[in-house]
Amino acid sequence: MTNLLKKFNEQQMQVLAKEIPEFRPGDDLKVTFKVVDGTSERIQIFEGVCISKRNRGLHSSFAVRKVSHGESIVSQFFVYSPALVSVQVTRKGKVRRAKLYYLCKLFGKAARIKERTTYVKKKSK
């Protein structure tokens, strides 16, 4: 029985696969998704910090936090959802935790995350 579910999930993941860049908690993301209001459909952009990532095959998801008008908003997105259009990494953050739920209580400068720098090794002669 579990093999049937596993095969079904793998098939659905291949059908719903999208080009999503690799990102980690602490990274600033720009998520574009479809919103359906009755009969009309529009595209909305949600920019914020990734505070968690959940890798569970077809049920994989990630949470993004942004501050709007002084209020903290956390939105959960499913990776294989047909409503998800694209994800862009705008800035890479340096954090030491996998889940950054403590950021929800912080505002302003206290909620800042340092930028992660990547170094390229030079080939020696």
Curated annotation (Swiss-Prot):
Cross-referenced InterPro entries: Ribosomal_bL19, Ribosomal_bL19_sf, Translation_prot_SH3-like_sf
GO annotation (BP), single: translation
Record flagged with keyword Nucleus: no
GO annotation, cellular component aspect: cytosolic large ribosomal subunit
Manganese as UniProt keyword: no
Record key words, sorted: Ribonucleoprotein, Ribosomal protein
One example GO MF annotation: structural constituent of ribosome
NCBIfam families for this protein: rplS_bact
Family the entry assigns: Belongs to the bacterial ribosomal protein bL19 family.
Primary role: This protein is located at the 30S-50S ribosomal subunit interface and may play a role in the structure and function of the aminoacyl-tRNA binding site.
Protein name (Swiss-Prot/TrEMBL): Large ribosomal subunit protein bL19
Gene: rplS
